[in-house]
């Protein structure tokens, strides 16, 4: 089986030696690595490394890669120092792996033969594949069942809410929530899986995997150099998504400002990650006429142009009518209800992926969209928009939300001696 096929491997925890914060990654890649057969994407070689350190975490405005491994973790200790040490170890390991190196300083093959390796080895010989690792904190990290386990309850951001129940939610508790999250994106699925697997290994005894999701075929472009991808309904998805080349809009809608929440000033330069596992009623959709599909979406299926006319990127004319005087873009179409003009100007940076998880006992495909969005404040952005879509969007008849999570993504690591989350625990 070609290694580029999406792997079905889950995360396996094993006892290992964590990479200390002092084990900073060195420039370069492992011996024998080659990116000659890795396709280009977003104007750069897909085998290249993406800088881990910076003002913001990578994996947000980074050009969206083709593959995803997302995992939510529960912290299984109440020891604050152990949690801090883990975040330091994760920072060091993430810095190494995003450069195409092993998770630990010794590697998978060069350690003591009677000790477990400090890397699992499945990415040895592979290029970095533009791997990014993005880490966030869930509401239950701050308080769980009313208990302030780590002395940070008073630093919980007001925007880090417990998401409300939406119509069409059928959330599985086993696919919902989490104290921590890790988003690993790469152009090679084996590289993404390797990243999450090794962070889980390093965290053995401190964290356990609560749930995880593999994704393929990005459903949004986050750069003007990327083409618009298609979702499993067959339509282009994310035509109007925010782009990295729009810094003013990114500042307004994605990055948390220094004055947004005085009690959570540690989040300045960070963002909020909304994750939703959305199952699609694929077989029902496949029996729906093309005309009805396009009416529900509000765009044509080929080019992705709005039904009001023009090309893919032509602004939607919501006032355009047909010969009968009916709106060309239906009042309950997805593109109308999700448009900023009908949501008080709200915009989000979407970074989702398609998924398939086999089939059920009736032979129906378990597939859909793993929705990811980065927002400055979910209370003012995601929640009102999702309420509107769940209530009025006819496309919701073909969708079922089965998993959910909201995470505070702290700013990046750019000062010497800092680590992901250091602003929270200072």
Language-model features, listed with the residues they occupy:
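Long, histidine/aromatic-enriched segments associated with O2/redox biology
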Residues: 5-426
């Amino acid at each position: 089986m070609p290694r580029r096929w999406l792997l079905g491997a889950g995360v396996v925890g094993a006892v290992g030696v964590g990479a200390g914060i002092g084990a900073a990654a060195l420039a370069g890649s492992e011996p024998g690595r080659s990116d000659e057969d890795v396709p280009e994407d977003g104007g750069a070689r897909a085998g290249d490394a993406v800088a881990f350190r910076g003002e913001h975490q990578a994996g947000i405005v980074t050009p969206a890669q083709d593959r995803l491994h997302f995992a939510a973790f529960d912290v299984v200790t109440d020891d604050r120092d152990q949690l801090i040490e883990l975040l330091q170890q994760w920072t060091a390991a993430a810095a190494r792996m995003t450069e195409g190196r092993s998770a630990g300083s010794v590697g998978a093959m060069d350690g003591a033969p009677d000790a477990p390796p400090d890397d699992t080895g499945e990415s040895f010989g592979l290029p970095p594949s533009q791997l990014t690792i993005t880490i966030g904190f869930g509401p239950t990290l701050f308080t769980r069942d009313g208990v302030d386990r780590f002395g940070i309850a008073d630093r919980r951001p007001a925007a880090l809410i417990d998401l409300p129940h939406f119509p069409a939610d059928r959330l599985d508790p086993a696919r919902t929530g989490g104290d921590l999250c890790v988003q690993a994106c790469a152009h090679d699925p084996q590289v993404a899986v390797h990243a999450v697997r090794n962070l889980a290994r390093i965290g053995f005894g401190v964290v356990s995997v609560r749930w995880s999701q593999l994704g393929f075929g990005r459903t949004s472009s986050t750069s003007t150099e990327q083409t618009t991808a298609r979702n499993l309904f067959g339509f282009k998805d994310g035509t109007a998504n925010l782009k990295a080349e729009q810094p003013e809009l990114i500042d307004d809608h994605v990055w948390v400002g220094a004055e947004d929440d005085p009690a959570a000033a540690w989040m300045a330069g960070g963002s909020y990650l909304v994750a939703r596992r959305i199952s699609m009623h694929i077989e029902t959709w496949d029996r729906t006429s093309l005309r009805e599909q396009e009416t529900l979406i509000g765009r044509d299926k080929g080019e992705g142009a709005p039904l009001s006319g023009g090309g893919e990127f032509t602004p939607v004319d919501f006032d355009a009518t047909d010969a009968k005087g009916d709106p060309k873009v239906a009042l309950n179409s997805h593109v109308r209800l999700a448009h900023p003009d009908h949501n008080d100007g709200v915009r989000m940076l979407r970074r989702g992926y398609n998924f398939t998880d086999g089939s059920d006992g009736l032979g129906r495909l378990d597939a859909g969209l793993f929705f990811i969005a980065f927002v400055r404040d979910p209370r003012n952005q995601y929640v009102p928009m999702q309420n509107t879509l769940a209530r009025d969007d006819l496309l919701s008849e073909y969708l079922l939300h089965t998993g959910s999570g909201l995470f505070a993504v702290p700013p990046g690591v750019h000062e010497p001696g800092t680590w992901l989350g250091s602003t929270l625990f200072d």
